[in-house]
């Protein structure tokens, strides 16, 4: 075909050398099998597939944005975090929508995310904000974690405006700070009641007012 025989010999020789150590056929077979599996998953379980990719890249904001754009093109809804629906990583709800993973929220650690999900799975959804703060381990979910949840919309399911968490009472105290203090007092009182001779279950600690 008009090609220089020496050049062709050189190319063939290089290919032979490469094939001697590259295991090209088995390598290609393995990768084709992986490609088939991922293509099958994406075709039959698109939301779950995309959620898994997002979880894999949860610390790479640019990659997450690209994947969210791809979800949009695939008509898959992506929703923000929710303490009553999100998992530790990105997950899919009953409607086939992808929920932002709690561990992907800036300022939230993996231990905090796991504590929230484990408590919810063990004792049911959080009824309201005060039920959440009564039940969650404040050692795992500290003030910074609570602030991150408020800012990211993780508490939106409770019907409280995000800015209200940072509002102040007539003493100049931020609601988020009074909420943490309430949680600490409630959990301490509950522990003391459980350890008492009478084994009382009822704990009475006044909830802090929500700024309006």
Residue ranges and their predicted role:
Residues 1-212:
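Noncatalytic, beta-rich nucleic-acid-contacting surfaces in large DNA/RNA-processing enzymes
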């Amino acid at each position: 075909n008009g090609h220089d025989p020496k050049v062709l010999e050189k190319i063939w020789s290089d290919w032979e050398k490469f094939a001697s150590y590259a295991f090209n056929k088995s390598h290609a077979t393995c990768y084709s099998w992986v490609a088939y599996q991922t293509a099958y998953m994406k075709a039959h379980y698109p939301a779950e597939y995309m959620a898994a990719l997002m979880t894999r890249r949860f610390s790479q904001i640019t990659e997450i944005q690209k994947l969210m754009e791809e979800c949009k093109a695939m008509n898959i809804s992506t929703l923000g975090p929710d303490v009553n629906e999100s998992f530790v990583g990105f997950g899919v709800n009953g409607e086939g929508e992808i929920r932002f993973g709690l561990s992907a929220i800036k300022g939230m650690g993996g231990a905090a995310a796991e504590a929230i999900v484990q408590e919810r799975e063990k004792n049911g959804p959080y009824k309201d904000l005060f039920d959440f703060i009564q039940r969650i381990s404040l050692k795992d979910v500290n003030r910074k974690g609570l602030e991150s949840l408020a800012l990211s919309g993780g508490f939106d399911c409770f019907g409280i405006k995000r800015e209200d968490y940072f509002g102040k009472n007539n003493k100049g105290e931020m609601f988020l700070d009074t909420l943490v203090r309430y949680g600490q007092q409630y959990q301490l009182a509950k522990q003391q009641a459980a350890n008492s001779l009478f084994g009382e279950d009822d704990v009475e600690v006044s909830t802090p007012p929500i700024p309006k």
